[in-house]
Amino acid sequence: MKGLKRTHRCTEISTANIGETVTLMGWVQKSRNKGGIIFVDLRDRSGIVQLIFENGSIDAKGFEKATKLRSEFVIAVTGVVEARSGAVNNNLKTGEIEVRANGLRILAEAETPPFPIEENSKTKEDLRLKYRFLDLRRPDIQRNLMMRSQVTTLTRQFMANEGFLEIETPMLTKSTPEGARDYLVPSRIHPGNFYALPQSPQLFKQLLMCSGYDRYIQIARCFRDEDLRADRQPEFTQIDMELSFVDVDDVIDVNERLLAYLFKQVLDVDVKLPIQRMTWQDAMDRFGSDKPDLRFGMELQNVSEVVRGCEFAVFKNALEAGGTVRGINAKGQGSMPRKKIDKLVEFAKDYGAKGLAYIAIHEDGTVKSSFAKFMTEDEMSRLVEAMDGQAGDLL
């Protein structure tokens, strides 16, 4: 690196820099040798720019080095920014320009990587994790981490403007049992005793409120010794906050405005405030989930009172046990084949249900049901009406 200093990241140059001499450093994405001219895609965290090595533009020694370039070589290159001589590449931020190299230094050679360093890799996860340092070079992974960094920075700015103080709380502390087991760290100066890593800063932030700090914020690392699930990890980071002299609406208001600010700044998406609110019970009643996707149109419908008194044992037993009978109207699915319905039944069983009862309403208005013989025609008609069943629907 002696005598070299990077002047730009790869995508920091544009048509405004045409004619300028720049020094770039990064990884070779790919190299194409066309005989007297070599094209190289140079990559850093900002993106890709095309380099040209050509006899006459670079000395013979430099051109010889360029012939040896392979994927993931780390290089430093000096050259002049030019408008692309060939077709513009609209898929690249730097697609209108290229850098004609007049100097090259190979900073590190590379063996053939175990998988392509490219976006949306199809490589198996265990291989990617084995070579995690290579996986982290992939553009989609880098974008995720850069977005995370941006969100963290913007959160700190927003909360500071709202009067919050960022205060770090202890990592080595006594156990404060919450929803999982603690991770324990043995104490050197107190043999036989252990520190517990925090499951959350809950007690500390409450003490801060008692101490008069009024508004606290921390990008807090938390540790929970529990089984992995899609939304559970042994260590995770959360935006942790506490406020004094407020009610629940004040807390919701701050969080809504924070989310709206982040969506606008990071994704340029406008979030309409106030955000729609829903009680936990309403979410469970309508969607069967405490984190429903409101775009999902097939809401659960409670038809317990409609079927109360019918002789269908499944409904009757559920109601007598204090349960409910609920259904979904799958619009336009009345002609679904029996084989596919059977697959849905098995799917429901996988998640703890004993089965599914269905009503198919044909286009001619006739009804086919798995339990029709246990209900009168009037009971079936009232059930279809309660679920807004129309010709072509599957209930």
Question: Model segments located where?
Answer:
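Class II aminoacyl-tRNA synthetase catalytic cores and aaRS-like
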Residues: M1-L395
